[in-house]
C-alpha cells in the first residue's frame, strides 16, 4: 500500500489495523558511467514496495536526496546538509505520528545517510518529549540497510564475489535495471568488475 497512491479514507482504514510504515530513503548521486543517478533511492523504494506488498504495510514516499557531498564533483549529484536531512526526517515522521503511526522502518539505500538518520531518530524522540511530555506516543524508529541484510549478502557473495564492492555495486545496478528496464545503460569498462576497496580517512595519510 503506497501512501501517494492511496486516498485519505484508505489511510484511515489502514490506521484502524496498523501503526507501522516503511520509509524508503536513498540518494541522488553518480553511480559510475552505467549506473543511474537515482540508484540508491530506486533500490530502497523497490525493496520497500516489495516488503510492503508482502506484509501489508504502508509505504511512505521515498526520501530521494540524502547525504552525498562526497559525490558533488559528478554532474547531476545532489546533496543535503546533515542538519537539513535530520530535520526532513524529523518532520516527515512527526507528520505521520500526528495521524497515529508509531512504528517506522527506514529502508536505506545509501551508507552516507546512516549518521544523519540515526541523529534524526533522537531528534524525533526529543521533540515528542518536549512537546507532548507524558502524553507522547511510543514512537519507535529503525534503520535497515537493505544491501546488508543476511539474505542479500549471501546472494551477492554467491553471484558477484569480490566484484560486489561497496558503491555502484552489481547488485544495486541490477535492482535499478529491474525497476527501470527501459533505462539500462552500457559502458566500456576496464576492468569489467572492480575489486572491493577500503574506506580511508585522514589518518591513513598522516
Question: Model-derived features: where do they sit?
Answer:
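Extended, histidine- and acidic-residue-enriched regions that form the cofactor-binding/catalytic faces
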Residues: 1-105, 109-206
Amino acid at each position: 500500500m503506497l501512501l501517494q497512491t492511496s486516498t485519505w479514507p484508505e489511510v484511515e482504514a489502514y490506521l484502524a489495523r496498523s501503526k507501522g510504515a516503511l520509509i524508503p530513503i536513498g540518494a541522488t548521486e553518480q553511480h559510475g558511467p552505467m549506473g543511474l543517478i537515482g540508484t540508491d533511492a530506486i533500490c530502497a523504494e523497490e525493496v520497500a514496495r516489495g516488503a510492503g506488498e508482502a506484509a501489508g504495510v504502508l509505504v511512505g514516499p521515498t526520501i530521494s536526496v540524502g547525504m552525498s557531498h562526497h559525490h558533488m564533483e559528478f554532474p547531476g549529484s545532489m546533496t543535503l546538509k546533515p542538519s537539513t536531512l535530520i530535520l526532513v526526517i524529523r518532520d516527515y515522521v512527526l507528520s505521520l505520528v500526528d495521524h497515529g503511526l508509531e512504528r517506522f522502518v527506514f529502508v536505506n539505500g545509501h551508507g552516507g545517510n546512516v549518521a544523519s538518520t540515526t541523529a534524526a531518530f533522537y531528534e524525533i524522540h526529543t521533540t515528542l518529549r518536549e512537546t507532548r511530555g507524558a502524553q507522547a506516543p511510543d514512537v519507535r524508529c529503525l534503520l535497515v540497510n537493505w544491501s546488508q541484510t543476511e539474505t542479500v549478502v549471501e546472494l551477492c557473495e554467491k553471484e558477484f564475489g569480490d566484484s560486489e564492492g561497496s558503491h555502484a555495486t552489481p547488485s544495486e545496478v541490477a535492482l535499478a535495471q529491474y525497476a527501470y528496464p527501459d533505462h539500462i545503460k552500457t559502458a566500456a569498462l576496464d576492468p569489467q568488475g572492480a575489486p572491493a576497496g577500503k574506506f580511508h580517512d585522514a589518518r591513513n595519510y598522516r
